[in-house]
Amino acid sequence: MGQKVHPTGIRLGISKPWTSTWYANTADYADNLFNDHQVRQYLTKALKTASLSKIVIERPAKSIRVTIHTARPGVVIGKKGEDVEKLRKHVSKLAGVPAQINIAEVRKPELDGQLVADSIASQLERRVMFRRAMKRAVQNAMRIGAKGIKVQVSGRLGGAEIARAEWYREGRVPLHTFRADIDYATSEANTTYGIIGVKVWIFKGEVLGGLPLTQEQPAQPKKKGRSPKREG
């Protein structure tokens, strides 16, 4: 059976950036890595209703800078910035250094893999038919401008006795092309029948030199015929 490599892992350093950008010596590396995990775990739990896309962590000179990418920045900030201040204090306590929190808004949540996967998972938990949830996500992504999208759900679909996987795809999702900008994400739906896994691949276009390519113009065909004779 053919196995698939993680679409983000294989593109790191080619067309995908790391979500933790810092350098540490051997003694501090493990502590920093575990610390990043704790910060992400806390923020994901605290901002469960804020439509989190990703959390980027930087560590400039004995401090920590956390950028929260979310579709609902108002929920993160809170009334007069009270909520974000609570988050900053807790992150600073976890990291043991001064913390700074930045918030980046996700303009098109329909094209964000993590937000699409979480949306499908929440629909499944609300007992929406899985085929309807998948089709709606695919149609919305294609309408907003995705070049292709694939959605897969697996588990006891519809309360069936035997677990299975079903997928739906529109457009093209070239997993073998390194320059393809593919946003891959997973999520889980906790239903009464057990956990249903959700996987989403969104193809947004091709990246060259770190920037998405615009639509290539077709080459103009050369005109046939004799070249004009020179006089003289």
UniProtKB/Swiss-Prot annotation:
Function of the molecule: Binds the lower part of the 30S subunit head. Binds mRNA in the 70S ribosome, positioning it for translation.
This protein's UniProt keywords: Ribonucleoprotein, Ribosomal protein, RNA-binding, rRNA-binding
Source organism of the structure: Pseudoalteromonas atlantica (strain T6c / ATCC BAA-1087)
Keyword RNA-binding: yes
PANTHER family (UniProt xref): 30S/40S RIBOSOMAL PROTEIN S3 (PTHR11760), SMALL RIBOSOMAL SUBUNIT PROTEIN US3C (PTHR11760:SF19)
UniProt xrefs under HAMAP family: Ribosomal_uS3_B
Subunit comment: Part of the 30S ribosomal subunit. Forms a tight complex with proteins S10 and S14.
One Pfam family of this chain: Ribosomal_S3_C
Protein name as annotated: Small ribosomal subunit protein uS3
Residue ranges of domain KH type-2 in the record: 39-107
GO molecular function, one term: mRNA binding
